[in-house]
């Protein structure tokens, strides 16, 4: 059923493969979390939205509302770029100020092993999904792509739950859906990236486009081809099912603890556009 009005929410959650196997957020059975509505769909200028869950988190700053979408809003029959636009149009209508994301990634860095966690500070975008926007009326400066406040909360929570957590690193984004060849991995390593995945972009710049902060938490689920050793599907599957709850807890912790008015500087990275392009 399509819902007409988008509920207000301070936080948006782009759930990824890190929490795909988990009933987020209800499955946490966390006293801080109250699910307000599930299976919410909205009509957007980019098509019907994916399903959203509306929930509330009680933390040190009181209550915060959030809208969460599973697997970045991707589904069969919808282009990934359209799914992202639908998702972030809903976030914009809801008044979202902070966006959190999770996902599984492959290691490009020989020091990163499966089940390690990276809270990245930068990214390299090799996708074809860059010329998209919800508003498109601002210059999006990427000097500081990740919100330092959200980043700090994700890192702090992850450090309490996982054995090895890294607070600095670059995420290289590809279109997918296939995995990379050894030659491609070798090339990508030369670009200075530490992990590779398919979901940080366009989310990271669509968040800035709508005036929201962004940070993500990503678990290494496999080695890139030619890195350390060949990965095994059974290990990748085990990670998806065994680690999802703790990744979800990190996201909820960040919602509960983050300061909505932190002096993070993210909005200084967003300036009015100087290009007044004609509309078709």
Spans of model-derived segments:
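Non-catalytic positions within long, well-ordered alpha-helices that form the structural scaffold/packing
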Residues: 92-95, 189, 208
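Short acidic/polar active-site loop segments enriched in Thr and Asp
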Residues: 97, 194, 213
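Metabolite-binding pocket within alpha/beta catalytic cores that recognizes anionic/polar moieties
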Residues: 1-142
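Zn-dependent metallopeptidase/amidohydrolase metal-coordination segment
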Residues: 198-235
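His/Asp/Glu-rich mid-to-C-terminal helical/loop segments that flank catalytic regions of hydrolases
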Residues: 225-278
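Active-site/ligand-binding-proximal alpha/beta "capping" segment
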Residues: 158-194, 265-280
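Generic non-transmembrane alpha-helical segments
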Residues: 149, 153-164, 249-257
